[in-house]
């Protein structure tokens, strides 16, 4: 399977608490809900399309527990995400949980790079990481993430956990798709390349 990382971030890279002020208040974060004012039809359609590519969800413990609390409570039959989120196989990377309450769930214990690497080797389409910024950053630095999808909100949070705060290795990415919604969200899709390219600036004449 390919591993796809989907994250909602602000212009200053904050990924904490996009959905509401109370979604994630850890570390005294009080600025949640920053994504909601910009939601629109294109955002819903595109993120629903992305979720339709998943054969499983790969989550860190904190995100898993939040999703397990919230998603089973959504009963709106017109919600385009609920059925998929609740029915997909979930894999939670944790050394503290022994079982999961949000079925079907498999607990992945031990070294996350090794356990996820074994899971990635199985046949299938996409194993998708949603939220779980720490897990996503670790797997991205380890070269296990194939696709990175970002929804960037036109706002600056000023504080909160950042998606790519101090990655442990450089990561090369190639932009393969981009859209701008009517409310100003950037929808970006990247593929990982083998190495992060570098160069030396020799003036603008080479590009004129």
Positions of predicted regions on the chain:
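Portal/gating segments that form or line small-molecule/metal binding sites
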Residues: 1-144, 154-208
